[in-house]
Amino acid sequence: MSTTTLTRREQRAKAQHFIDTLEGTAFPNSKRIYVTGSQHDIRVPMREIQLSPTLIGGSKDNPQFEENEAVPVYDTSGPYGDPEVAINVQQGLAKLRQPWIEARADVETLADRSSAYTRERLTDEGLDALRFTGLLTPKRAKAGHRVTQLHYARQGIVTPEMEFIAIRENMGRERIRSEVLRHQHPGMSFGARLPENITPEFVRDEVAAGRAIIPANINHPESEPMIIGRNFLVKVNANIGNSAVTSSIEEEVEKLVWSTRWGADTVMDLSTGRYIHETREWILRNSPVPIGTVPIYQALEKVNGIAEDLTWEAFRDTLLEQAEQGVDYFTIHAGVLLRYVPMTAKRLTGIVSRGGSIMAKWCLSHHKENFLFEHFREICEICAAYDVSLSLGDGLRPGSIQDANDEAQFSELHTLGELTKIAWEYDVQVMIEGPGHVPMHMIQRNMTEELESCHEAPFYTLGPLTTDIAPGYDHFTSGIGAAMIGWFGCAMLCYVTPKEHLGLPNKEDVKQGLITYKIAAHAADLAKGHPGAQIRDNAMSKARFEFRWEDQFNLALDPFTARAYHDETLPQESGKVAHFCSMCGPKFCSMKISQEVRDYAAAQTIEVGMANMSENFRAKGGEIYLKREEV
């Protein structure tokens, strides 16, 4: 852990340098490949890990090798993972989905922004130095049209986004020929239906049923289509965003790029400080993954942080502002009802959700029902016009294991189920947010309650943390719960960093949180039996048994750390071909001994076989040629 503390000026300068020198970069011994689709000029990016051959015999002077297949893996890094792509943060990413959106002929380009706040920001010359220069002219559904992926799915339309996703979810496993790599244990999926092969039609059917969502705002054409659903790979979200006391636009863009490099499937911008609007624009124009927000945070900033002064009008304007910028999903705390707030009074830690506490305070101060609940249909109308998915927030989630699975938590969950049905009336895609802090033996109930109460809409949880005693290590305490609930059926896991409960995460914290949660998600995919999930594990195990150290590093989720740990004790190049590591040394390496046992057993088998043949030869009288009837 680094102990170097940079000043705010140094942090910003470092982030600016990162942005100015940003290039497409592949992981060690990996290359970017594109798998093409059958329609719409679809090219799905993946990372292919190149492997070295296996020594299978021969002599020192004439060794014999067997080639090992390259291993394709899911890649969230977008253009940032392709060395052939020129990166310019000032211009933003290529608009991958724009031709698909325009070809559907159901959107119109707006003459002006719908949000009064946006119009005000755009005319403020004092913001010119901060503003992203290549602003998009926003689009909206034509009158009488809905432009959501759920709407298309219900019409029986397989969109380019759906085909892109089908190819992506299969992870290029059709390229793998080795039976050793293709071997996979049967999973236990708790009633999920995982197909042998994910087809575009399967994607369409899951979206149409509401069991999966494709967050894909028509004003975020830079994003690469992905899916969140129980019957697909478990996804991971990373949170970034400035606060009133720290971080800048440069640092948040740096964290965005860093997050996609380390496997974030979506990113939430939770900015609460200055220049929220401008920061979000830079993030969206440079993001290859869906971006989510909690609009109530910005609405609160517009009323100077006074929850009691929030109004539906200010919130609605914020929704329009963010939808026209391209936000792909909104967290809306519409389930925090006035009658549920007293249920939290007996809790040890009360209401720990920022959005939940804001709405609870508003409800109590006005003694009125939550205006997000009261205006929920209007929220859905806005979302349907831009294809913004709804992430129904768990404002009453437990903030300690003592408060887990209580009346307040599940009362809100049941309300979220009612709101889900309303959103579906408008063809709006929905996922449900979940806890929180839950001990291991109480986690599965959260999944079963969500499936029953929310009609199998995708579940999206923060952890859950399985114990409260480890500040500084809550990426571990929550990673345990995340792996469990992912196995039980949770579709997306919101990462927790080492700074949880302690401070705003920096770049290294983001990486630590993501690696922890990619492990949890992958462990869940293995346990569920997601097709092809075990290929990378098998490749790693084979490389490990054959002492192919470079391949072990390169197959790792974090090749750099794996290599660094190995080189701490065996830094010489000879250590990377040695048939042992520093833990056991050459005499006690179990895998080296296993290889020797295997070779010895094979030799013994041959020797025994030859002895049997010799005995049989003598029993036949020692004749070289036998009579036909004796054969």
UniProtKB/Swiss-Prot annotation:
Annotated binding of [4Fe-4S] cluster, by residue: 581, 584, 589
Cofactor(s) this protein requires: [4Fe-4S] cluster
InterPro entries tied to this protein: ThiC, ThiC-associated_dom, ThiC/Bza_core_dom, ThiC/BzaA/B
Catalytic activity: 5-amino-1-(5-phospho-beta-D-ribosyl)imidazole + S-adenosyl-L-methionine = 4-amino-2-methyl-5-(phosphooxymethyl)pyrimidine + CO + 5'-deoxyadenosine + formate + L-methionine + 3 H(+)
Residues engaged in binding Zn(2+): 437, 501
Record keyword Cytoplasm present: no
Keywords, alphabetical: 4Fe-4S, Iron, Iron-sulfur, Lyase, Metal-binding, S-adenosyl-L-methionine, Thiamine biosynthesis, Zinc
Biological pathway: Cofactor biosynthesis; thiamine diphosphate biosynthesis
Gene Ontology molecular-function annotations: 4 iron, 4 sulfur cluster binding; carbon-carbon lyase activity; zinc ion binding
Gene3D superfamilies: 6.10.250.620, Radical SAM ThiC family, central domain (3.20.20.540)
Cofactor binding annotation: Binds 1 [4Fe-4S] cluster per subunit. The cluster is coordinated with 3 cysteines and an exchangeable S-adenosyl-L-methionine.
Enzyme Commission identifier(s): 4.1.99.17
Gene Ontology biological process terms in this record: thiamine biosynthetic process; thiamine diphosphate biosynthetic process
Keyword Phosphoprotein listed: no
A single Gene Ontology CC term: cytosol
Binding site for substrate: 239, 268, 297, 333, 353-355, 394-397, 433, 460
NCBIfam families according to UniProt: PRK09284.1, PRK13352.1, thiC
Function: Catalyzes the synthesis of the hydroxymethylpyrimidine phosphate (HMP-P) moiety of thiamine from aminoimidazole ribotide (AIR) in a radical S-adenosyl-L-methionine (SAM)-dependent reaction.
Record text on subunit structure and interactions: Homodimer.
Protein family: Belongs to the ThiC family.
Protein name as it appears in the record: Phosphomethylpyrimidine synthase
Organism taxonomic ancestry: Bacteria, Pseudomonadati, Pseudomonadota, Gammaproteobacteria, Enterobacterales
